């Protein structure tokens, strides 16, 4: 009986998948100054854990491009230390100055752009311009939120929801009832 319960518990925990985690990044007046790699740009890093797998990105942002800069020039890169990653250009089709809001999400897995972080676990973000208008500094500003979905390499098993626990406990109860009934029948 104890071996049966142990086997059932092992099976329950072995069938759970790794849990996705999210990183929500609040943006408040994050300026975009120059081309990628410029020391003037805003660069952030977040430690998500060694070899974490980046699986999705969502954004809800308001961008302002100062004339003569265009909204389509504001870019943020999401990269590993080894520079694997993606570029996000929310206003890609908007070739004008001014302010506009953009919101969307994407599964990087579904579009074949998912990537893993390096052993240092750092996700790097750089806010930059795809074309630097030298006559204006900064070229633009970001406000809103960016959300990164990822799976840590060492994610533990999922924690069952209450309904799952109830179903699992009911199953254990039935196994116990059957074992007791069998034992009474043999006595």
Where are these regions (language model features)?
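Mature extracellular "passenger" or substrate-interacting domains of secreted, surface-exposed proteins
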Residues: 21-157
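A short, hydrophobic C-terminal helix/tail in secreted or cell-surface proteins
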Residues: 158-180
């Amino acid at each position: 009986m104890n071996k049966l319960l142990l086997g059932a518990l092992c099976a329950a925990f072995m069938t759970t998948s790794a849990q996705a985690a999210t990183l929500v990044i609040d943006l408040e007046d994050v300026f975009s100054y120059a081309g990628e790699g410029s020391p003037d740009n805003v660069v952030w890093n977040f430690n998500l854990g060694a070899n974490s797998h980046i699986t999705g990105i969502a954004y809800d942002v308001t961008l302002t491009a100062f004339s003569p800069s265009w909204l389509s020039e504001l870019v943020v890169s999401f990269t590993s230390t080894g520079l694997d990653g993606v570029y996000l250009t929310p206003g890609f089709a908007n070739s004008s100055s001014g302010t506009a809001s953009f919101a969307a999400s994407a599964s990087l897995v579904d579009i074949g752009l998912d990537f893993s972080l390096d052993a240092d676990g750092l996700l790097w973000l750089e806010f930059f311009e795809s074309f630097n208008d030298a006559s204006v500094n900064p070229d633009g500003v970001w406000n809103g939120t960016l959300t990164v979905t990822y799976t840590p390499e060492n994610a533990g098993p999922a924690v069952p929801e209450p309904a799952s626990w109830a179903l699992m406990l009911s199953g254990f109860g039935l196994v116990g009832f059957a074992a007791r009934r069998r034992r009474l029948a043999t006595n």
